[in-house]
Regions:
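C-terminal helical cap(s) of enzyme catalytic domains, especially alpha/beta-barrels
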Residues: 27-37, 57-62, 76-114
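Glycine-rich phosphate-binding active-site loops on the catalytic face of alpha/beta enzymes
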Residues: 12-27, 50, 62-84, 91
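Short N-terminal micro-motifs specific to bacterial/archaeal maturation
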Residues: 22, 46-49, 98-101
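A general secondary-structure boundary signal
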Residues: 13, 43-45, 109
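Catalytic cores of alpha/beta
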Residues: 1-10, 31-36, 44-46, 50-69
Length: 114
């Protein structure tokens, strides 16, 4: 817990973390401990892999004050030319022809569970 204490001593007011795991569901045990240890000295903000489905369970276990949740939807871009063999976004070959937005209705649904 030294890193958490170091952040507090340095004056940080918030830390975004998945609990030293790839996602919050995997790091939930450590996140629960960090939130308890931090108390009101720093906000531990769990983030990565939180969905509408797992949020209630994670919220009840971790008991953080804030959460970072990605709730997207996509729309088609207005691009006319779609060369399917050229990828500008790197090796993962993500769509070049969509725009990702935050879904306000999904956010409202999650907020309604608080």
């Amino acid at each position: 817990y030294k890193s958490l204490e170091d952040l507090i001593k340095l004056g940080f007011d918030r830390v975004l973390t998945s609990g030293q795991e790839a996602t919050v569901p995997e790091g939930a045990d450590l996140l629960e401990e960090l939130v308890q240890i931090a108390g009101d000295r720093i906000i531990v903000m769990p983030g990565c892999g939180i969905t509408e489905r797992n949020f209630p369970k994670l919220r009840d276990k971790i008991k953080a004050k804030e959460y970072h949740i990605y709730l997207p939807y996509e729309t088609m871009s207005k691009m006319k030319f779609h060369p399917g063999h050229i990828y500008m976004g790197g090796l993962l070959r993500q769509s070049e022809f969509t725009i990702t937005h935050t879904s306000s209705s999904r956010v409202s649904d999650v907020m309604g569970t608080l």
